[in-house]
């Protein structure tokens, strides 16, 4: 089963189109990370949070990414990083049209 990584942290913006323009180079580098299948970017201007949900090919790749990304976020001044690693239940996810390969 592929692991799913959820990361979120306090974020004061920008949001929407402005964050798209600001973070596009980062997105283009993230897709090159070893073992990453996909990432869904998350943001909430109302609660001042951002993050993402990531699907990896294996737990080692997910753990390596979490460690690297936590260092990157911390170096950028981000505090309050929350992360959870889950196993994906493929059969049930497929029934519910989960984007599982």
Identify the residue ranges that each predicted region occupies.
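Short S/T/G/P-rich N-terminal loop/turn motif that feeds into the first structured element of a domain
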Residues: 1-49, 60-67, 84-101
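A short, exposed loop/beta-hairpin motif centered on an aromatic-Gly-Thr core
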Residues: 51-55
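A common structural junction motif
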Residues: 70-78
């Amino acid at each position: 089963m592929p692991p799913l990584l959820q990361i979120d942290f306090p974020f004061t913006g920008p949001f929407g189109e402005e964050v798209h323009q600001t973070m596009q180079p980062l997105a283009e580098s993230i897709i090159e990370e070893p073992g990453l299948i996909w990432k869904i970017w998350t943001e909430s201007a109302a609660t001042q949070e951002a993050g993402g949900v990531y699907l990896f090919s294996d737990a080692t790749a997910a753990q390596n990414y979490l460690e690297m990304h936590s260092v990157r976020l911390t170096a950028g001044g981000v505090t309050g990083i929350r992360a959870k690693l889950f196993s994906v239940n493929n059969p049930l996810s497929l029934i519910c049209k989960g984007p599982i390969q």
